[in-house]
Amino acid sequence: MAMMAFVSIVGSLSRQLGLAPWQAGMAVTVSGVLWMLMAPIWGRASDRLGRRAVMLTGFAGFFVSYCAMSGWLVAAMRVPMSVGLVFAGLVLTRGAIGGFYAAAPTASQALIADNLPPERRVAAMASLGAANGAGLVLGPALAAQLTHFGLEAP
């Protein structure tokens, strides 16, 4: 939910911060690219280190990265800084968000495959996919509602 929540506010946020449209697009894209690039790395790590350890590391990294992005954006709205600096901080934190998030679906799917009998795997994988889809829909919707309290709220 949180990773996609940013998508609903990036337009307003980028205008407020003076970012060009391509910079806003890059901030959204970089997390997806790093998600894609990091998934196989997290998959190998989950084979070596264990599924739960990788999931917890990924969730912790995601949480810290999201807090860093939020803090960076709040600071950028309150303290004058160059557009280049705002953009660099946004791209770095969004990249970290995508990179750490990649651990979650990779290790979750492996955990299901490792621990459920074959007759229950399909339903469990479908439930995981449905939960991910719900987050993709509900995250931006919730963030849009939270903007009534300001762009910092989501």
Where are the language model's segments positioned?
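Helix-loop boundary and gating motifs at the non-cytosolic
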Residues: 1-32
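Interfacial helix-cap and linker-helix signal at transmembrane-aqueous boundaries
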Residues: 14, 45-46, 145-148
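Central cavity-lining transmembrane alpha-helices of secondary-active solute carriers
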Residues: 29-43
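Transmembrane alpha-helical cores of Major Facilitator Superfamily
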Residues: 29-33, 60, 126-134, 138
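C-terminal ends and interior cores of transmembrane alpha-helices
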Residues: 60-83
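Cytoplasmic helix-loop-helix junction between adjacent transmembrane helices
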Residues: 93-132
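Helix-loop-helix hairpin linking two adjacent transmembrane segments in secondary transporters
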Residues: 132-154
